[in-house]
A protein has these predicted regions:
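Hinge/lid segment of periplasmic solute-binding proteins
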Residues: 1-30, 41, 60, 188
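Aromatic-glycine-rich donor-binding/catalytic loop that engages nucleotide-sugar donors
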Residues: 38-52
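Short helices/loops that flank or line small-molecule/ion binding pockets
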Residues: 61-68, 151-167
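Glycine-centered hinge/linker elements that transmit conformational signals in sensory
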Residues: 63-68, 98-100, 104-149
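Acidic, glycine-anchored loop motifs typical of Ca2+
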Residues: 73-83
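Beta->alpha turn/N-cap motifs
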Residues: 91, 169-174
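Extracytoplasmic/periplasmic substrate-recognition and gating elements
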Residues: 178-197
């Protein structure tokens, strides 16, 4: 059993569920960031694995790499879902993952095992403000909440069509949806909040 998950989910010495290596869906639903290696190289983005390994893969680093990557593919002079972006995201569960990748928590246990809600904190507010700015104030970043109709496959479709340098998703997407992709892609973790994390 996953020790950290069992510890995190136990309340009053009772764990209502557990996860092990046998839970393939838990592994498949591990969130990550995919990147198109050819597009990344075309935009001068190299050494991503080194950036990650050196602890420099932060939300600000993602922003600096992607904020100016935009091509108006449909030539309508409007930024919309038909264009190429540096980073594309779906608007639902893939956004929740930032809380954990930034080092945040919903609940915390004290030394006695008592649980308290810590989600509503200045740190969480900082996370939300940063993500709102990240997704809505940068030409090179697109989130499908701007689309007239929601599709959970939007980012994957853009990525497989080579219209996004980066997308966030889950490891299982590589097996289910990215096999048909002609370009090579890489898998890296969600960004950290800052290098000190």
């Amino acid at each position: 059993w996953s020790e950290s998950t069992t510890d995190d989910l136990s309340v009053n010495d009772v764990c209502p569920l557990a996860i092990s290596d046998f839970a393939l869906s838990a592994l498949a639903n591990t969130y990550c960031v995919f990147y198109n290696k050819r597009l990344a190289e075309n935009y001068g983005i190299t050494d991503l694995y080194d950036i990650v390994n050196e602890g420099k893969w932060t939300i600000d680093k993602v922003l600096s790499l992607t904020k100016d990557i935009y091509t108006d593919l449909d030539a309508d002079n409007t930024a919309n879902g038909a264009d190429l972006y540096g980073f594309i995201s779906t608007a639902r569960s893939s956004l929740n993952t930032y809380l954990w990748s930034f080092g945040g928590h919903v609940l915390e246990k004290d030394a006695n095992g008592d649980v308290s809600l810590v989600y509503h904190s200045p740190k969480t507010n900082d996370f939300i403000e940063k993500l709102c700015s990240f997704y809505f104030d940068n030409q090179g970043i697109y989130i499908n909440s701007k689309e007239p109709e929601y599709s959970s496959f939007f980012a994957l479709e853009k990525f497989t069509n080579n219209e996004a340098v980066f997308i966030n998703g889950a490891i299982g997407n590589s097996v289910e949806y990215l096999r048909s992709m002609e370009d090579d892609y890489g898998i890296i973790p969600y960004p950290k909040w800052d290098e000190a994390q």
